[in-house]
């Protein structure tokens, strides 16, 4: 690790490309990271069966509202802090450099973890599709390493190149989901029609096992906070970033709430749990639920297209999180928290050193999982996706506290709703969400203790589960200690370089 150094003047080698992204370019990266088609085929069916049944759409809506409340303060803060470190910088400004550094390490681990999780899911789906469609039998890790190399190549170029590719893939993905939702809506739903109350009334949302549904819903939103990461590359970031944040959350919320409602209504709200169990083979193939609804209300032709789009959705997520992790490495290197060499950019103004670091780390983990013979879904995907969502929600909680502290201290914005009320409401929702995530971590990560039932028991984790769930908190503490140690050796003036 290098010592903290003042941020150097912007030169060709240490500054990102300016004014490359507009609102929609940033939204493409963020919504692509959420991988809505993957969520519809994976998280939604599981939440229906193990969570609160027909009320899963309302759960997504409620989580979306919590995150919109979070975004009020987040967007307000982005007017005062424009930095590729985003959360790192926000928390540093509000709670001090030590906590800011700790949160930076937590965020970085979260982005690396979710990318690894997507690699695992991609390997499973790609291996299955290639074998079924073309008879090409190959180990999951072969397809993963091909995607790993391609993601690195694309991340090497200007950020707007990646945005254009993600835009094309995302439009196809959203269009396919919209067709399914509208088809069910215009047909009036299944035998029971379009039941609003069964899906959106509070009494329905908090029935059954809502904790499981909320855990999966929060997991489906991971990546939305990445809007501010692109602040330095945005056109007019003080306007672009807040707009992109609100728009991204609205798109994700509406998409998950409406399409999952269409899935529930298409089958029938009173029988959705039993039918989902039967259609998916007791969740052995959760994607079968969406395929069944699509077959019935649109046609098998769209189902076949969507099976391919699941792969493009996963690939889009890989590229989005590659960009996020690379930019965190860049920001932390520029601040001196990590080696200064990480703040280098290439001729395309992309964070080349950060991208290399991300690629090397993920490559090592993928190869290790392959050598050990671990399962790409049960281990690589489940472990790292659960770890990532706990880490991100932890950092979001700190951001809420930092926003309140920052504006109380500086008085730069005195609007109560933006700087106090909305952040407090969001904090309450996020704390509740984090509790549910940890309580049901065994179900999310597949790390239940021997003899326990993760669908019923809370906090029943094996050793691996406890290591994963406590890791973000340990990293926060160790990172804060590291940050304080670095600053204590330096001039107080360097704090601004670290958090701005």
Predicted regions located by residue number:
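Membrane-interface "cap" regions at the ends of multi-pass membrane proteins
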Residues: 1-55, 67-68, 72, 194-203, ...
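Helix-loop-helix junctions that connect adjacent transmembrane segments
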Residues: 12-19, 57, 133-139, 168-307
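Extracellular loop-to-transmembrane helix junctions
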Residues: 41-140, 463-480, 487
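A generic transmembrane alpha-helix motif of multi-pass inner-membrane proteins
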Residues: 43, 62, 387-395, 417-500
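Transmembrane helix-loop boundary segments of multi-pass membrane transporters
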Residues: 46-57, 124, 128-140, 160-170, ...
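Membrane-helix boundary/coupling elements in multi-pass transport proteins
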Residues: 83, 106-121, 221, 226-234, ...
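TM-loop-TM module centered on a large, flexible mid-protein loop between adjacent transmembrane helices
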Residues: 89-90, 96, 128-132, 244-319, ...
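Membrane-interface loop-to-helix entry segments
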Residues: 140-191, 244-253, 391-394, 409-428
């Amino acid at each position: 690790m290098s010592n903290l150094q003042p941020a150097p003047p912007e030169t060709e080698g240490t500054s990102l490309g300016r004014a490359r992204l507009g609102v929609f370019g940033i939204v493409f990266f963020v919504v692509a990271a959420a991988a809505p088609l993957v969520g519809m085929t994976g998280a939604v069916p599981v939440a229906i069966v193990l969570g609160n049944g027909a009320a899963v759409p309302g759960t997504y809506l409620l989580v979306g509202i919590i995150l919109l409340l979070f975004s009020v303060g987040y967007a307000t803060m982005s007017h005062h802090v424009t930095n590729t470190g985003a959360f790192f910088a926000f928390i540093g400004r509000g709670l001090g450099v030590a906590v800011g550094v700790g949160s930076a390490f937590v965020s970085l681990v979260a982005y690396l973890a979710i990318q690894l999780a997507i690699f695992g899911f991609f390997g499973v789906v790609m291996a299955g599709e290639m074998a079924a469609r073309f008879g090409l039998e190959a180990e999951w890790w072969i397809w993963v390493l091909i995607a790993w190399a391609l993601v690195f190549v694309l991340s090497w170029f200007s950020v707007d190149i990646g945005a254009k590719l993600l835009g094309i893939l995302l439009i196809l993905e959203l269009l396919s989901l919209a067709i399914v939702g509208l088809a069910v809506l215009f047909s009036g739903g299944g035998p029971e029609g379009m039941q609003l109350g069964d899906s959106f009334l509070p009494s329905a949302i908090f029935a059954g096992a809502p904790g499981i549904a909320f855990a999966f819903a929060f997991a489906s939103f991971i990546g939305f906070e990445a809007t501010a990461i692109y602040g330095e590359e945005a056109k007019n970031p003080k306007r672009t970033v807040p707009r992109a944040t609100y728009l991204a959350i609205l798109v994700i919320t509406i998409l998950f709430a409406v399409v999952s409602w269409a899935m529930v209504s298409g089958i029938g709200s009173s029988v959705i749990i039993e039918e989902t169990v039967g259609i998916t083979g007791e969740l052995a193939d959760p994607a079968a639920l969406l395929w069944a609804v699509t077959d019935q209300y649109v046609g098998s032709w769209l189902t076949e297209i969507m099976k391919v789009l699941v792969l493009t959705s996963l690939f889009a997520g890989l590229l989005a999180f590659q960009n996020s992790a690379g930019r965190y490495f860049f920001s932390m290197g520029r601040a001196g928290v990590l080696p200064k060499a990480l703040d280098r950019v290439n001729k395309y103004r992309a964070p080349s050193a950060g991208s290399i670091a991300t690629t090397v780390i993920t490559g090592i983990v993928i190869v290790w999982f392959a050598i050990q013979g671990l399962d790409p879904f049960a281990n690589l995907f489940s472990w790292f996706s659960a770890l990532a969502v706990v880490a991100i929600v932890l950092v979001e909680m700190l951001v809420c506290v930092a926003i309140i502290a920052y504006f109380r201290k500086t008085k730069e914005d005195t609007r109560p709703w933006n700087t106090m009320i909305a952040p407090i409401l969001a904090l309450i929702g996020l704390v509740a969400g984090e509790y549910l995530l940890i309580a049901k971590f065994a179900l999310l990560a597949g790390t239940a203790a021997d003899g326990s039932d993760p669908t019923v028991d809370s906090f029943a984790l094996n050793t691996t589960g406890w290591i994963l769930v406590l890791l973000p908190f340990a990293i926060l503490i160790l990172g804060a200690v590291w940050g304080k140690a670095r600053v204590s050796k330096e001039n107080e003036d360097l704090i601004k370089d670290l958090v701005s």
